């Protein structure tokens, strides 16, 4: 199955959701290339770069999207499949 490169931006409005967000990211550690957090007073931003199959990426973003108090946006690069 083809692997794709992409990124996800996670906006955490409810800091109580942070442990659940971290658990989801840990479960998908095998596709995560880079993770960077930007803590602010009222919210937190997390940027993640990943490489995985569309199924793996869908699992990651789907699980994140079901967490209350966060917003998730993802993007995949077109035509940059990896072996």
What are these regions (language model features)?
Residues 1-83:
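Long, contiguous binding/interaction regions
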């Amino acid at each position: 199955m083809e692997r794709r490169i992409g990124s996800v931006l996670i906006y955490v409005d409810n800091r109580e959701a942070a442990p659940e967000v971290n658990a989801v990211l840990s479960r998908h550690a095998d596709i995560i290339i880079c993770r960077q957090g930007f803590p602010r007073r009222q919210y937190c931003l997390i940027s993640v770069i990943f490489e995985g199959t569309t199924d793996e990426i869908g699992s990651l973003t789907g699980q994140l999207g079901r967490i209350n108090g966060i917003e998730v946006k993802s993007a995949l690069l077109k035509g940059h499949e990896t072996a």
